[in-house]
Amino acid sequence: EGYREYIKNQITELLTNYGKIYTLFWDIPPKIDDPLLNELARRLQPGILINDRGWDKGDFSTPEREYRATEGERFTRMTEACNSLGRQSWGYRENEDFYSYRHLVSSIDRIMAMGGSYLLNAGPNAEGEITEDYAGRIRRIF
């Protein structure tokens, strides 16, 4: 109960002290089951888009890593597919086992062809920097 109250206070602060907020991307443990959190967000920021990792279906889907689909299939709702440059971590990891350039480009192409957007994650190191091994891969893709 204390953690739920903490989340409510944080959401209230974020959605009232920083102007117009367009998107709320939940990424928290599902054991916090409180549909009122999405209601609070929508009350504080009318028109906000909320992902599907909260307590209702949200406004858009967020599949992670590998998304299997039939050739020619299209998403039936707004979708932002997520992946990371590396196979082992969503953040920075020294000696990361990176996905191949070909794999990432193919994933991006597939999601975009289905009508979705693609979030490619690259985490900073302990000094807050995106290291060259990560940055170089991003430059090569984009």
Region locations from a protein language model:
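Mature catalytic domains of secreted/periplasmic carbohydrate-active enzymes
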Residues: E1-F142
